[in-house]
UniProtKB/Swiss-Prot annotation:
InterPro entries: FTP_domain (IPR011096), PepSY (IPR025711), Peptidase_M4 (IPR023612), Peptidase_M4/M1_CTD_sf (IPR027268), Peptidase_M4_C_domain (IPR001570), Peptidase_M4_domain (IPR013856), Zinc_Metalloprotease_M4 (IPR050728). It catalyses: Similar, but not identical, to that of thermolysin. GO terms for biological process: proteolysis. This is Bacillolysin. Ca(2+) 3 binds at residues 427, 433, 435, 440. GO terms for cellular component: extracellular region. The keyword Magnesium does not apply.
Amino acid sequence: MKKKSLALVLATGMAVTTFGGTGSAFADSKNVLSTKKYNETVQSPEFISGDLTEATGKKAESVVFDYLNAAKGDYKLGEKSAQDSFKVKQVKKDAVTDSTVVRMQQVYEGVPVWGSTQVAHVSKDGSLKVLSGTVAPDLDKKEKLKNKNKIEGAKAIEIAQQDLGVTPKYEVEPKADLYVYQNGEETTYAYVVNLNFLDPSPGNYYYFIEADSGKVLNKFNTIDHVTNDDKSPVKQEAPKQDAKAVVKPVTGTNKVGTGKGVLGDTKSLNTTLSGSSYYLQDNTRGATIFTYDAKNRSTLPGTLWADADNVFNAAYDAAAVDAHYYAGKTYDYYKATFNRNSINDAGAPLKSTVHYGSNYNNAFWNGSQMVYGDGDGVTFTSLSGGIDVIGHELTHAVTENSSNLIYQNESGALNEAISDIFGTLVEFYDNRNPDWEIGEDIYTPGKAGDALRSMSDPTKYGDPDHYSKRYTGSSDNGGVHTNSGIINKQAYLLANGGTHYGVTVTGIGKDKLGAIYYRANTQYFTQSTTFSQARAGAVQAAADLYGANSAEVAAVKQSFSAVGVN
């Protein structure tokens, strides 16, 4: 059944040059490959690894800047120094390779370049091993960057609001930030305007308003939905408020209750007894888990879910039971598997709201919490009833706090695929009838065997399974839910093996699939990573974990080749 008609504006093609065997090893004999990947359009490196510099006693940031200054011609920095062209955003240690990871943002005369982020790995002996991320070239030659005439940010917000065509109630006050923006072959200054709202339908829009002319150059919605079929939630008259309704966290005693989920199965629930009520507030993990009731309205977060006897068996409770339980299981998967403490690896609370709107056929991550509709009973049942859906949406938050892949075009499709991969792995972790379908537990409840997407066979639901079959239009943010099928198929082949388009892949299992993609997403992917760059990052991640000459590295290469990504 065809679920959607989407398309993707794809980024430029890539050329890869691999040279000279294996570079010197990272710590603990984890190897770094010697690879150079060039962007064919701008002819500058976008992923380079190997023995890039000699060992020094310098700080990691200085090592990276020294290398970039020596390679100014390759990266087309012009007369600007590396120190003037990049701003260090984060410096962290990588336990796997005992290296230092430096994340950077490209800037031009102090103004950040949209989507141009880089990540570098410097070994403990002070040598640069990996530099990932596309650099915007020849900015000093761009005529529009010489134009200092700009409209005010407030005017840019006004233009974006006019283009939006509705007057929403904003969740966050609109703001406009100045960026250097690459608009096709033209580079200009643009205000990036963020409009975040829930009514009339959820939106977290980014508008790109040219700073001198006020022209709308681009716009897209970064609300991360599980499906692109986003119909506005129909609002009902607000239920009468309970005078005892609670929004803020409560203090009390940890308890264990029970409840029935959307599919009728019984689950144990970590709750908090405060006063005479039991709240869906789980204090037992490194991150507190909260579950709220929107009461069929579109106000967030709603009221903290409460019950009188710690038995959540009413039909209305089911969506909350699953949202609460599955959020905990998703936390457990990331903690047990990667020692990650919540979505930001720093114990951020996990907030979920159920009964959002009326008959709302979607679920989404809005940048700060999870939101689930009840479905209309035909297309969807309550969307919190799918553990892969919850794992999918919370993985968007993990990505937001690591690579921060832009939710448009190839980087957006990669973002979606990563969420499908880990949503599926969370389902396997909980061993709840696991499979390689997405949303099968909550999609078309009256039709057995149906799902939103299939990782084993994306074409089953109209999605491409090979790069040659990709969509090249602009709907759905450039087809983020459609072209994710290409990476989904690659991931399935990597885990399970098989022959696809004449390429045979030796499967390495789902656990190693997760390890490679988690490392690639947190260590090598950047905001604008394309499928081709993702291949390079995943190959290096496998080399870090299993060795440069390992079967796992070979399998990663095979799996990407099988879906036409080189």
